[in-house]
Amino acid sequence: MVFVNSRHQGNHYEQMAADYLRRQGLTLVTQNVNYRFGELDLIMRDGNTLVFVEVRYRNNTQHGHAAETVTRTKRARLIKAANCWMLANKMNSHSADFRFDVIAIHQQGQHIDWLKNAITEG
């Protein structure tokens, strides 16, 4: 598939990830939440648990797994963005049940890995 730009490509794979997670029983809360310091790709619910999902794509695994591209800096930005989103929605990390997952997509969507609790605070 040919994409006009990286944002178009990102939207395509984020939608693929959302559809995949829906088939696994999660429900979409919102997507593409932007803050000046970071973005939340997908926010889903898995029962009573709020799930912040980072979607990563690599055409192939020759240079590593897509999940390996979630750097320490990226993890810190995701945690900060999630805390901001929870505060804006009258929640906080002490009262809300939440986790950070990564959806790693390879080979134009032919292979999808779902890593639950892939990002932990601290």
UniProtKB/Swiss-Prot annotation:
It comes from the Bacteria. One of its GO terms (molecular function) is nucleic acid binding. This is UPF0102 protein VC_0580. Belongs to the UPF0102 family. InterPro entries: Restrct_endonuc-II-like, tRNA_endonuc-like_dom_sf, UPF0102_YraN-like. It comes from Vibrio cholerae serotype O1 (strain ATCC 39315 / El Tor Inaba N16961).
